Amino acid sequence: MASGLTANKKLRHKITAAALLVTLGVVYGDIGTSPLYVMKSIVAGNGGMGHFDTDFLVGSVSLIFWTLLIITTVKYVLIALRADNNGEGGIFALYTLVRQRARWLVLPAMVGGAALLADGMLTPAVTVTTAIEGLKGVHINGNILIDNQQQVIWVTVLIITFLFFIQRFGTDLIGKAFGPIMFVWFTFLGVAGFIALSKDWSMLRALNPYYALHLLVSPDNKMGLFILGSIFLATTGAEALYSDMGHVGRGNIYLSWPYVNICLVLNYFGQAVWLDQNSKVTAFNKITDFNPFFQMLPESIRLGAIILATLAAIIASQALISGSYTLVSEAIKLRFLPRLHIIYPTRLKGQLYIPVVNTILWLACLAIIGYFKTSAEMEGAYGLAITITMLMTTLLLYQYLRSRHAPAVVAIGTLIFFSAIETVFFISSAVKFLHGGYVTAMIAFIILAVMYVWQYGGRIRDDNTYRAEMASLFAYKNQLSELRNDPDYPTYTTNLVYMTQIANDHYIKKEILYSILDKRPKRARVYWFVTVNVTDEPYTAEYTTDTYGTDYMVNVQLYLGFRMEQQVNVFLRQIVNDMMREGELPTQPQKYTTIPDRQVGDWTFVLLHEELSPQTQIKGFQKAIIQARLRLQHIAVSPAQWFGLEYADTIDETVPLVLGKIPITKLNRLTRSQAEAQPEDEDD
């Protein structure tokens, strides 16, 4: 029997004015706040004000323009957005589309995901700090609002702490304001940039890629190739753009990106013109944390611009926080990470909250702010990890194109072209390792190590489960039938449920049958064996059943999308009613009940917990991985919470985890005289 379950199906994202506003608020927060620090980083890297000329500025904005065009527009908007999994995007969604091609593709998926999570920890810190630094030296009624970096740090910490605190309540209410605010922000970027650019239209020659390439070898560029480490900051939000596709739809991104891109480019060009016209003003050399974004604005509107920039930075941070929840949730469903407690604070699709992730992100942000102290120092660490994610995405995109039978020249050309560019960006960003990049590299390594232990440990366990530990349900049909009708044993429950994995339609781990028959015979009317299969599609909600020709044994195969909540208790109640309606199971009328005409009896769920047995035969590295995986289970959410059984009647039983074939040692029986003839131990 196959059927569908009630679920939140994927919505068709219509292209409307409201949807476009939502897109601005959800998708572009990261890339939209880049003008706050990109030109600042480029100028500081070359020695600051007075250490560059017009050609340097033209080459810099030319590099920014072509980076946005090649990486963001061509790779992500035109190519990657077409590689969607039922409308969902991101590196894990892309992996699910190609994982059948080769087993090793799990590695680039985990590396890319770990790097993306690590870099996301830095984004809230750098964007909010940069915005608040704009308040330094600003006068209100003759008083300086903020006059030192210590005050910047405290204000930043308060804002970020508040942002993480409100996550548990859901952000749908304030989220409705994100779109309009970001529309105002991008419009402000474009208008401010256009006004500055109008003072010197010759800056438009930067659209010629010659100036970009020339700057890389120009003596005016003191950073050489490493200037690309700062240029790359302009496109770090491209990966988030792809990951957030499922929230807004491809069409809304297609239509909104040109406007966003134009506003960004205008602002970068405007900053370049202002820098060119003010490069010789020595007074700017005395400004700590000099930022051309704020300095090019008239004093009269600077405070309003700082407030708007702070709101944009908060929205960008919120997008990264929500994206991290989604990324971790997908990793859990793909068995890359241990099961964690996930809360759905609102009824909105895709809005979730993971307490442990929220706490880790918050503490990481505070540690980063306390360690680096200034946005300039943070920029030195920013962007290194995301280059790795982009390289991994390119590799998976190549596999996707091959799986869709794209011409070999197109697939290979895409791989070579983008890999070459992103490798150059990676090399240029590698210098950041010594200037703080080691922080994100270390975080990414820790996340990757956890992913590797969990995923590879699970594979070792599955590959080494000895066949003798599996048993056919057919072989025990008669015993289960006799037990359910045996009056010598009290009824344990009406419906007894085991969460398991059934192989070849009828093989289950023998420990389950041992739990039913040997440990303490559990008499029930129906024995349920439930398997949850996570599908490559995000919102699948289907099931199949097999009763093996009985009315007391049911094999349930649940097929749930990798973004679906596993509410097994709720789903089983629908399934049993479906089966009773079809005549596959008899009704279970209850004599004592508060529910009139109740036809379904009580349920008990038995959850088995594994502990590594001393008899396990695997050795060395594999045994260490298994032991590490079992330790990770202590931080994981309980199976009852994971399967949606918090309020159900559950029984926990511990079983030994035996991997590999156990050698059988045969004892020789001695007669009494032979035993007495044995030499005695001198120590006794």
Swiss-Prot record:
Q: Which GO molecular-function terms appear in the entry?
A: potassium ion transmembrane transporter activity; symporter activity
Q: Which UniProt keywords apply?
A: Cell membrane, Ion transport, Membrane, Potassium, Potassium transport, Symport, Transmembrane, Transmembrane helix, Transport
Recorded coiled-coil stretches: none
Q: Which Pfam families match?
A: K_trans, K_trans_C
Q: Which residues cross the membrane?
A: 19-39, 61-81, 104-124, 151-171, 177-197, 223-243, 255-275, 303-323, 352-372, 381-401, 407-427, 433-453
Q: Membrane topology type, per the record?
A: Multi-pass membrane protein
List the catalytic activities from the record.
K(+)(in) + H(+)(in) = K(+)(out) + H(+)(out)
Q: Which InterPro entries match?
A: K+_transporter (IPR003855), K_trans_C (IPR053952), K_trans_N (IPR053951), Kup (IPR023051)
Q: Where in the cell is it found?
A: Cell membrane
Q: Which GO terms describe its cellular component?
A: plasma membrane
Q: Which domain of life is it from?
A: Bacteria
The free-text function statement in the UniProt record for this protein reads: Transport of potassium into the cell. Likely operates as a K(+):H(+) symporter.
Q: Which family does it belong to?
A: Belongs to the HAK/KUP transporter (TC 2.A.72) family.
Name the HAMAP family on file.
Kup (MF_01522)
Q: Would you tell me the protein name for this molecule? A: Probable potassium transport system protein Kup
Q: Which organism is it from?
A: Lacticaseibacillus paracasei (strain ATCC 334 / BCRC 17002 / CCUG 31169 / CIP 107868 / KCTC 3260 / NRRL B-441)
